[in-house]
């Protein structure tokens, strides 16, 4: 009789073994290589991710980012897909699939109101402007990624983005380092491997990320003005056709190593920054999915 009663109670309990894990929502602002790496890491750690940027984003490292989702509706990065959501109402349907990131042009404030995220990450890495004020009293955890963020002022915590031993460090008191001003050299080439927009306009190109070009090759135009390759190498960065470009904005990056494989996937710097963002959530015990089982925590120190 005792066994029958126990069996009856067990049968009446809901089967929790096959219940899906709860995936708290996170918002990432900026679909460049850093923002995309952050979104990728959060997704792999078990969080639902909404990646936000404005229409026709100008980011150049499209082989290392989800930027193309804003142009063709979908993009893939290191085995994880992003799907563009034209309507804020479609975002929950994409997140419910649990296998992809939702990309949108809706404001982060509007998405936050609708979805009540546990964290908001500004991963635009703005270099020459004051950081955005994300911190909200009683709101979700806010994380500032990039130079000039002051933890406790602009955001709850900040993530260091400058090359060095502190790259990806979680800063809970104080600020990240100021913008250094000069890019890290690759095969001896520094700023000369970039092309910056001489004027505002619409970008047009028939070239592809990873394509190898020679110095002085015509690779694009900006409202009809030719954009010329500054040196020989592979197109690691190239704004998308139709991108809205501001004067002085980076539109082309040449990798002088001429290896197309280096133009795709998660770069070292974005990956380390993304690990820092996940670590910031773990420190606040904002756990989800594999993070709650320690999988992501182990990968933070690889």
What is each stretch, according to the model?
Residues 3-5:
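Short hydrophobic alpha-helical segments enriched in small aliphatic residues
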Residues 9, 15-302:
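Well-ordered secondary-structure scaffolds
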